[in-house]
Amino acid sequence: MTVIRKTHPLIKIINHSFIDLPAPSNISSWWNFGSLLGLCLAIQILTGLFLAMHYTSDTATAFSSVAHICRDVNYGWLIRYMHANGASMFFICLFLHVGRGIYYGSYNMIETWNMGVILLFAVMATAFMGYVLPWGQMSFWGATVITNLLSAIPYIGTTLVEWIWGGFSVDKATLTRFFAFHFILPFIITALVLVHLLFLHETGSNNPTGLNSDADKIPFHPYYTVKDFLGVLILLMAFMILTLFFPDILGDPDNYTPANPLNTPPHIKPEWYFLFAYAILRSIPNKLGGVLALVLSILILALLPLLHTSKQRALTFRPITQTMYWILVADLLILTWIGGQPVEYPFIIIGQTASIAYFTIILILMPIAGMIENNILNLD
């Protein structure tokens, strides 16, 4: 009798994706982050669903409804902090996942990579709108500042901003629609994830050598299911330590003050995972220029396949580009730090230097390094 997992129309799909999937025998723990991101998405959808049962998207009651969840709902505090810190864990995994993709040249699987870039934008949009929902000071002013950036678009900017706001300022209409979008987007993200996996399984996974691994494949289960489970345990341990011992460490104290349109906080800043992009935005004095730089700081990922000059796929055996890569990582950490600092000397000039370095390394230095390495190895 044929095994049901190989014949049943539905189970067969799961079998080909997670059980009998041929996987390279040498993929390292850097390949764990895909499954960890799936776990993060599941946690966010579940905790978000329970929060939505008690939350009210009205400017008069939004803040107090979040307080009510934390004080009066059974384990409401846990659900709320799991959701808030779950977003941070999500972005940590995302950044590591993208970083792995850049290091090992996974961007050469163009459909999978572009789907991933779209996913990154979708997750960032979802997180931004979620941050607005508690209706604290930083929620309100963050929403005001970031949506107002669209007014830099020539001709249609002002109209577009008022259309998104549903009025002449961030108000009840804005909060209601942000809640609606924040609720629906994770399900759209789930659909996009399936497409991402569909494209990945067309080509098969990359591996640390960057070489073709068709000659040496092993089944996904039990090898990588067990390996992924170890990653899951480590992630959950870190997640629960963060949630139960340091729930507010990544948040902003200003968000415990109800939104007040008449009182601007001294330093408006987004959550930590947007600070690098916020620093790039602020480092350009011109409004439209800043917005373009902000979008390009993420969109530049889609250009990576075009900027790949090396005859080798991964950075494993390319010391010059490796050096550039780690300088880029350090540069992103500097940008993240600068994004949380006030706009004054010396932070302005550090931010501008780091922003120029970010684009220079990706657009100029890494492609040149690739060509130099080809020359050294006589690969051209």
Curated annotation (Swiss-Prot):
GO biological process, one term: mitochondrial electron transport, ubiquinol to cytochrome c
Membrane-topology descriptor: Multi-pass membrane protein
Listed transmembrane segments: 33-53, 77-98, 113-133, 178-198, 226-246, 288-308, 320-340, 347-367
Signal peptide: none
Cofactor(s) needed for function: heme b
Annotated GO MF terms: metal ion binding; ubiquinol-cytochrome-c reductase activity
The keyword Transport is annotated on this UniProt entry: yes
Residues at which a ubiquinone binds: 201
Amino acids binding heme b b566: 97, 196
GO cellular component entries: mitochondrial inner membrane; respiratory chain complex III
Purpose: Component of the ubiquinol-cytochrome c reductase complex (complex III or cytochrome b-c1 complex) that is part of the mitochondrial respiratory chain. The b-c1 complex mediates electron transfer from ubiquinol to cytochrome c. Contributes to the generation of a proton gradient across the mitochondrial membrane that is then used for ATP synthesis.
Additional remarks: Heme 1 (or BL or b562) is low-potential and absorbs at about 562 nm, and heme 2 (or BH or b566) is high-potential and absorbs at about 566 nm.
Protein name: Cytochrome b
Organism: Microtus felteni
Gene: MT-CYB
